[in-house]
Amino acid sequence: MAAVSPMHGTPCAAECAIRGRKHGRRLLAFAIVVISTCGTLHAASSAVRQSFDIQVPWVPQPASLGGRTELVYELQLANFSDDTLDLESVDALDGATGASLGHLDGKALDAAIGRVGSTPAKRSVAPGGHATIFLSLPAPAPGVVLAHRIEYAVAGTTQHFPVEGGRFTPRPANPVALGPPLRGGPWVAIYDASWERGHRRVLYAVDGRVHLPGRFAIDWIKVDANGAHASDNGSKPANWFGYGADVLAVADATVAATRDGVAEPSVVAPGPSRVPIGDATGNYVSLNLGDGRFVFFEHLKPGSVLVHPGQHVRRGDVIGKLGFTGQSTGPHLHMHVADANAPLAAEGLPYAMGGFRVDGTFPSIEVFGAGQAWTHHTASPRAPGMPGPLDVVTFTSR
């Protein structure tokens, strides 16, 4: 038998050597992949940043406001980074296509930002700080998923970054149908989403959660044809044109709660009445409309509440009289719909009011406050919904 050269080894040894070389190549390839992957992971990790938590605390449904169908809701931002972050822009996006459904920057963004406490630099959110963005945009088609992109800068640097979040699908439109809360007119629908201390912006955290009960609240104040709201300088509640007007049930409903006996100031002083938060409503009535919806009538005249809890009322029944109790700048009827029988611990809901026509509008709250004339339009019936901000209306049916 011929000798086998040690150099070549036995057939078994040769096979093992070949396997060893292949195994070595596989290990080398694996090592290259690992090194490459580590580089990729390192690059990706360097791009990850702490920034804003973006939440939509209440999922909206479309609302008819002044003949326009809109989504009215809020973004809650919390800064979880170690840096102060300066807000630059906010976009509401179609979550599927990325198309912008609404954009805010500059002065429009400034006007949409709400902060708790005194914060002169509204766009600058310190570490651990919070901001609320109050949004109103044309309602998208049913089923569209919304997302939001926040562009921000790191304070004191030239770094700018985007972050996306706050995805939701709007609820289907399902406003409760209501009748007029008052008779005749002209009555002014006092509300505007841009007012910094208006109902739309006042958040309450009274039960371990933050709520916005007045999201769609309206303060109704009666005026005359020339825009005045009182027969004198307005210093006496009884001289306001709407004072003592009958307040009407807006639907067939069950009385859910009442409060009466809150005293009324004898004079109307500049600025809102200073009262404890629990007394802000003054005398009030709430009606259970069913389906988890309640309507509130606030600031009623002392001794005027005519109903009691558990009582059934019909649309158009008199339930009280317009007054000047609680936190109020003057005699008016505050009305809103919410998802719980709690004046403050509930979420404000849209509604569809019928039985009114629009006679005109005030061009600004300053014009109204000065008692100047409102702009008269050709009177037009309005489809059920909510009147527009500062619309002047006449209620035409019970």
Protein language model features and the residues they cover:
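Short, solvent-exposed loop/turn segments enriched in Ser/Thr/Gly
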Residues: 57, 67-74
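Short glycine/threonine/proline-enriched tight-turn/helix- or strand-capping micro-motif at secondary-structure
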Residues: 58, 199-249, 258-278
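Intrinsically disordered, low-complexity Pro/Gly/Ser/Thr-rich segments with frequent PxxP/GP/PP motifs
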Residues: 103-141
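Acidic, glycine-rich catalytic/binding loops that coordinate metals and/or anionic ligands
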Residues: 172-192, 198-202, 231, 274-277, ...
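Short histidine-centered loop motifs in beta-beta connectors
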Residues: 248, 289, 293-316
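A structural signal for short beta-strand/turn segments enriched in small hydrophobics and glycine
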Residues: 253-255, 310-322
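Zn2+-dependent peptidoglycan hydrolase active-site motif and core
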Residues: 254-301
